[in-house]
UniProtKB/Swiss-Prot annotation:
Its main location: cytoplasm. It catalyses: ATP-dependent cleavage of peptide bonds with broad specificity. GO terms for molecular function: metal ion binding; threonine-type endopeptidase activity. Protease subunit of a proteasome-like degradation complex believed to be a general protein degrading machinery. One of its GO terms (cellular component) is proteasome core complex. Na(+) binds at residues 162, 165, 168. Belongs to the peptidase T1B family. HslV subfamily. This is ATP-dependent protease subunit HslV. It is found in: Cytoplasm. Allosterically activated by HslU binding. It comes from the Bacteria. Signal peptide: none annotated. Coiled coil: none annotated.
Length: 180
């Protein structure tokens, strides 16, 4: 799966989850087509935050399907995520989609992939996309060695990822989901 062109980072703290995504859209390996794309958004009655890495068209298809699962299961994030991952893995059309999702309701943070993975990180930090490893490392260091809030951590860690990953820029979208 080719995930070049974006970085999505989410960090959970006592107040909830903050998620950030950069805005760069890259055509192939060399051309930046857009600087301010919105890859993190609020879904399901603005109660769930979700971010995507991968093909934009594929991600929108997955957002639609995921939101339908949330409707079907009354906003139950874990149940909707598991059912979405099952469909994603089994369905011939969905299996070809190249994207990953980070989703949160403020209490639970999950990473979903087309291989059927539904992963809740042990430390409350998750990242996807080409700059994901850089953002993840920076966020974990900031989480362990500072008293910054989740929102401050995602903002600073994404800045570091943007310095290291040519497919990640500093035009961030940040969304917060507070614990219920």
């Amino acid at each position: 799966m080719d995930l070049k062109g974006t970085t999505i980072l989410a960090v959970k703290d006592d107040e909830g989850v903050s998620m950030a995504g950069d805005g760069q859209v890259t055509l192939g390996q060399a051309i930046v087509m857009k600087h301010g794309a919105r890859k993190v958004r609020r879904i399901y009655k603005d109660r769930i935050i979700a971010g995507f890495a991968g093909s934009t068209a594929d991600a929108f298809t997955l957002f639609e399907r995921f939101e339908a699962k949330l409707e079907e299961f009354g906003g139950n994030l874990l149940r909707a995520s598991v059912e979405m991952a099952k469909d994603w893995r089994k369905d011939k059309f969905l299996r070809r989609l190249e994207a990953m999702l980070l989703v949160s309701d403020g209490t639970t943070l999950l990473m979903l992939s087309g291989t059927g993975d539904v992963i809740e990180p042990d430390d409350g930090v998750a990242a996807i996309g080409s700059g994901g490893p850089y953002a993840l490392a920076a966020a974990r260091a900031l989480q362990r060695h500072t008293a910054l809030s989740a929102q401050e951590i995602v903002t600073k860690a994404m800045a570091i990822a943007g310095e290291l990953c040519v497919f990640t820029n500093d035009h961030l979208t940040v969304e917060n989901a507070r614990r219920a």
